Amino acid sequence: MAGLWHETNTFAVEQNDSMETIHIKRGDALLPQEHVRNFMGGFIEGANRPDVELVPALEIGFSHGGLIHAKVYEHCRSMIVDALREAKPLDGVYFAFHGAMVAETPYTDAEGELVQEARRILGDIPMVGTYDFHAIMSDLEIQSLVPFPNNTNPHIDGYERGLEAAKCLLQMLDGTIQPITHRVLV
């Protein structure tokens, strides 16, 4: 389980230009969210089976709504990738994303590049992700994981999307489904 949560407003004055602008939860600090009605809480509750061991890696959020500086993004991505690498071997991965993060150039797809790097180090294992209603999901994400975005506005169904993501991941691990995802632009 890993999370990277930020909705960037590229017009915002306050930018995320230092590590002091991030909030980090590591390891078991993610687990108290079990009964919280958000993405992570739904996933944790939905994956609660005797044969499942949850491996909480890292969740990162940001203080300001503005652009993520390249060095800050690189550091955050490295922390998540390193935590996933240390947790190997893993059977599957759950990501909690907002899906509208913008980092400085040269990064044009913050969440997608993170998912691609996770796929590179972990191999062909099932991956799912939850997203905010207005996420900008890229081909990198669609090709690498099964997305579960909010269905409602206001966004009151994060918990339900977490439950769905857990159910899907468990079914993929059990071998009962093999989802195929496509991006449809509207």
Locations of regions flagged by a protein language model:
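N-terminal amphipathic/basic leader segments beginning at the initiator methionine
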Residues: 1-49
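Short acidic (Asp/Glu) and glycine-rich catalytic loops that position anionic groups and cofactors
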Residues: 23, 144-149, 184-186
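Short, glycine/charge-rich beta-strand/loop segments that flank catalytic centers
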Residues: 59-64, 95-98, 135, 183-186
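Low-complexity, highly charged intrinsically disordered N-terminal segments
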Residues: 44-85
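Active-site histidine-anchored catalytic micro-motif
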Residues: 5-7, 70-77, 85-174
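Internal, active-site/partner-interface "lid" segment
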Residues: 173-186
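Active-site-proximal beta-strand elements of phosphoester/diester hydrolases
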Residues: 2, 57, 149
